[in-house]
């Protein structure tokens, strides 16, 4: 008589774990790597710009070379060229931060203005007081000769009044001229804006370079600016009105 040998029972298969729908969680090692590298690149770029500004203050644009900036930071010139295509671009972007702060300062000054003329008056006072309070920064922006660089090489958006201080001044001059009955063309707006810009730059640069000149007594700076701008506005509007009357005749 034969007896069947009982078959061995198969081990139960492990149950599959349910997988939730949606993307897999990020791998910390992978996700933080690029971000860390970006931060390092940003920090290194800022070190190069700071070094360029330091050299500008010491010896002007002629003191700024790719080699000199590399030596200041302790890197090779290849690293500098990796961020900036040439010396002109490097110097331009080294000064961009000052120009943006300056533009923001002017923009804040006109927020409480009650008229186009008041806006122009406020921005003129803000321009001069900023320059005289920050002479080193002002020298870098407007008194230190720099190699020309294409607009697209700047980090400032051309024509954006929040970053481009001249664009703000031009818009304010245009707003003032728009109060006149006669139509105003772009050439007239541009000429008036440049006259205003050169006027406030003139008083600022003189205050910075020779404010202690003993040969004449200067008016308090705000009083000086306000009087000057009122005369400018009166003369400009009179000239526009006279030109309109002549053209009608």
PLM-predicted stretches and their roles:
Residues 41-52, 69, 94-98, 102, ...:
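Generic hydrophobic, amphipathic alpha-helix propensity
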Residues 1-43, 54, 240-249:
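N-terminal intrinsically disordered/low-complexity leader segments
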Residues 93, 107-137, 160-166, 186-196:
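Hydrophobic alpha-helical connector segments
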Residues 26, 142-145, 208-212:
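Short, flexible, mixed-charge acidic loops at enzyme active sites
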Residues 51-55, 130:
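Short amphipathic alpha-helical elements of helix-turn-helix/winged-helix folds
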Residues 151-159, 163, 176-230, 239-249:
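Hydrophobic/aromatic-rich alpha-helical bundle segments in the mid-to-C-terminal region
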Residues 47, 55-89, 93:
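Helix-turn-helix
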């Amino acid at each position: 008589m034969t007896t069947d040998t009982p078959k061995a029972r198969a081990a139960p298969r492990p149950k599959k774990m349910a997988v939730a729908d949606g993307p897999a969680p990020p791998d910390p090692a992978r996700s933080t790597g690029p971000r860390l590298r970006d931060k390092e690149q940003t920090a290194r770029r800022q070190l190069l710009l700071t070094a360029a500004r330091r050299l500008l203050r010491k010896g002007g644009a002629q003191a700024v070379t790719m080699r000199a900036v590399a030596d200041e930071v302790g890197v090779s010139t290849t690293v500098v060229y990796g961020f900036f295509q040439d010396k002109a671009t490097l110097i331009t972007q080294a000064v961009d931060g000052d120009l943006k702060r300056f533009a923001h300062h002017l923009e804040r000054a006109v927020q409480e203005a009650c008229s186009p003329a008041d806006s122009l008056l406020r921005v003129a006072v803000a321009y001069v007081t900023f320059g005289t309070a920050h002479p080193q920064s002002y020298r870098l922006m407007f008194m230190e000769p720099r190699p020309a660089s294409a607009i697209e090489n700047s980090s400032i958006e051309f024509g954006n009044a929040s970053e481009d201080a001249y664009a703000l001044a031009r818009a304010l001059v245009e707003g003032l001229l728009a109060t006149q009955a006669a139509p105003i063309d772009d050439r007239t707006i541009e000429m008036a804006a440049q006259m205003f810009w050169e006027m406030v730059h003139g008083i600022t640069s003189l205050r910075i370079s020779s404010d202690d000149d003993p040969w004449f007594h200067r008016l308090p700076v705000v009083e000086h600016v306000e009087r000057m701008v009122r005369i400018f506005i009166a003369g400009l509007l009179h000239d526009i009105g006279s030109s309109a009357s002549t053209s009608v005749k």
